[in-house]
Design a protein with these regions (language model features):
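Noncatalytic regulatory segments and standalone regulatory/sensor domains
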Residues: 11-18, 24-34, 125, 140, ...
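Secondary-structure boundary/capping residues
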Residues: 75-76, 129, 192
Length: 225
């Protein structure tokens, strides 16, 4: 994750909660086209983004959003989890086993499973966000973006560059990063994920499947003890 946090350009403006995301669903996505969802028609759980501050801390921040979902807003910060219980490997970040232990210590029932997209949808419909490991192009999870990314008209060329860079990363397996995201909702053939760097983002089911494939559809499902 360190590579992604070393890039520089204009600051990103994350969609930190469902209402902020609803105002501009097409502007925060892994997709170049067809990114928008219609929030009144979208199943979207009321999670709140806990912004990632360290390159190895995505698991801690994703877990913080989950804990705050189950136990109440402001219960914990990912930065505090990371400071108190850093991953054994501070370059790669948290393992699923470490996150399971942290979830248990935080009063959540957590189980590691292999679950296809249909199963993820079932969890969402039961009101349970799902934590999944993904392998993504680093350009998609950097904390800074290309100039003009958030400006109408100027944003499209920057997004095209980002999309092309991501495509090359996938094809060459260069600058691909292991990352954790929370699946927070879905609509049709798109999922909404809460990504620790940029907040709520849409992603096509096809892309989501590709990014999950290196981990064999692994996931962690949660409920309150």
């Amino acid at each position: 994750m360190a590579l992604a946090f070393g890039l520089s350009a204009c600051a990103i403006h994350p969609a930190s909660d469902p209402s902020a995301f609803a105002a501009r669903t097409s502007q925060n996505s892994f997709e170049l086209f067809g990114a928008a969802v219609d929030p009144p028609e979208t199943l979207l759980l009321p999670l709140v983004h806990d912004p990632q501050e360290d390159g190895a801390a995505c698991g801690a921040h994703a877990l913080a959003s989950l804990i705050n979902y189950w136990h109440g807003a402001g219960t914990v910060r990912g930065a505090d989890i990371f400071a108190a219980s850093p991953p054994a490997d501070t370059v790669i970040g948290y393992s699923m086993a470490e996150l399971l232990a942290l979830a248990d210590a935080s009063g959540l029932l957590a189980s590691a499973v292999r679950i296809p997209a249909a199963g993820v949808i079932g969890e969402l419909e039961a009101g349970r966000p799902v934590l999944v490991p993904v392998k993504v192009p680093s350009v998609y999870v950097q904390s800074r973006q290309l100039p003009g990314m958030n400006v109408p008209v100027l944003g499209l060329p920057a997004e095209i560059v980002t999309s092309r860079t991501a495509w090359l990363s996938e094809k060459t397996n260069w600058s691909m990063l292991n990352h954790f995201v929370l699946v927070a909702g879905y609509e049709g053939d798109k999922f909404v994920v809460l990504e620790p760097v940029a907040g709520f983002r849409t992603i096509s089911a096809q892309r989501f499947e590709r990014y999950r494939a290196p981990f064999g559809d692994a996931a962690i499902v949660f409920s309150r003890k």
